[in-house]
Amino acid sequence: MAIHKPLENLYIVDLDQPLEGFYNFLNSWVYKKDGLTIAVDPGPRSTIPVLVEALKQLKVERLDYILLTHIHIDHAGGAGLLVKHFPEARVICHPKGVKHMVDPSKLWEGSRQFLGKVADVYGEIAAVPEKNIGYQNPVEAGDVVINIFETPGHAPSHLCYQIGNLLFLGEVAGINYPLDRALYLRIATPPPFIYEIYRASLEKAASLDVSHVCFGHYGYRKDVRNVFDTALNQLDNWLATVEKHIRAGSDPFDELVYADLLKNDRGLSLYYSLPTDVQSREKIFSVNSIKGMKDYLQNK
């Protein structure tokens, strides 16, 4: 288990999974200040024991809030189990996602269909008691104010949370891999993807006055402008590249699009600096993002 303290009051808990390349990929955030403790994206069921042990090491006896950026299994699947350990916790979730966290049967079924064995590794989504979950904006807890912003580009239930100068991004700006000062960024546009909504969500997040952005995948960055400029450029570049290959009738489509992106996309420029198993992981998720864009272009 690894716990990092990048800033005062802020901790990263690594949630590595027993899958190829699934390290430096998932994390949960813990924010502690003046007796208040907040967890952002507790992760899947499989690593709730890791998070609980981390909270124990951080001397957390009371968990006040669990903030869900969205209800995908890798971010929210373990929330119900975490509530069993901390029954006083209030789970904050987009209104569209509340019913799916109270009764996650359809969400679990969809996760298994979409992710296959990866969902099985993550573990079945744990139900959150209805009395523990809801939505309010802002959340005021003593001197701490949590402002919430709807950013539905990656998922309809996606939210970003601002606490002071920190912005918890979820996946609104994609996926970061820690490479010292250099930026590796990969977009997250799974089906169903709608370009206009995704771009508006990115622009909304980019407009906020913050000093650090905290990713659901993975870690944090303080070059905030660079992150959003790269993400916006990447969004438009990927869409244009996918459209070019649709018009050309490229086959095999995914392989040719991805090869093109590795040559022309600045967010992916450090792809070959990644460990080989992480490259394999990133290719799988990139192909899924390509599919989201292809479906959008063919159906609009």
Region locations from a protein language model:
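Conserved beta-strand hairpin/beta-sheet module of binuclear metal-dependent hydrolase folds
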Residues: 2-57, 161-171
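Metallo-beta-lactamase
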Residues: 5, 101-150, 156-225
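Active-site neighborhood of phospho(di)ester-bond hydrolases with catalytic His/Asp-centered motifs
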Residues: 40-43, 64-71, 92-94, 151-153, ...
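Active-site metal-binding motif and surrounding structural segment of the metallo-beta-lactamase
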Residues: 48-94
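Histidine/acidic-residue-rich catalytic or RNA/ligand-binding cores of hydrolases
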Residues: 224-233
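Charged, amphipathic alpha-helical linkers/stalks
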Residues: 232-250
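C-terminal regulatory/interaction regions
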Residues: 244-300
